[in-house]
């Protein structure tokens, strides 16, 4: 008997229960995938209304050995000091200064990053440095860098929804579709996924917008509309950790693919309301960034 034949009715109940819980799927709806080594055709359980996935690091970590070029890093001449470290050590809080000498960057990308580096170094601190600082979506893969606030998941036979606590932003991964021929660019693009090895969700994303402040990291690394992102979300054997290995390809921006990783831990907390526009202050003076408003509708 197939997995869906065995659990299809339960999953249909999940879709109903998920709606009752403000879009967060009840853990009881999914069979215990990790009581023993998962079968290759089983589905990992990421979803619950009672727990989320949280990470406490703001930047990408190195990928597994042999995965290729790692993430873009800081200029070692200007070490980054975050708010927590600044408060603890009484150092001046700084903004990330990117290593624009990294040979993986195309000339235009290095020049754009260097321009923002110089704005920071010259003291022009009022500029917003990421989409998130203006309460915009983080995009793909940048949305994965949200620290300290968990994301939650809904799983159905046709889709996986990733719901961030901040602004309750929703990213949809379609499990039964193929990529469209002409994808309209958007913040989260078009994400097509499938399961592998009983513990991994593989997500392939194209059609990502190049709007201002849409970066792949917190070092203000830009991208073109040719950006192609593949994420492999693997749940730990104890079901208490979640690791993503991310591969970024963009032949107009990078001379080779980038690889990076991110790890979350299970937190037994329900989703709460977090409204970004109430908290959109800058690093230095607690000045509020303006919330952007469109001059005309885009629909």
Describe the predicted segments one by one.
Residues 1-14:
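N-terminal secretory signal peptides that target proteins for export/translocation
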Residues 2, 25, 36-37:
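Basic, alpha-helical terminal appendages of large translation-related enzymes
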Residues 14-29:
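Bacterial N-terminal signal peptides
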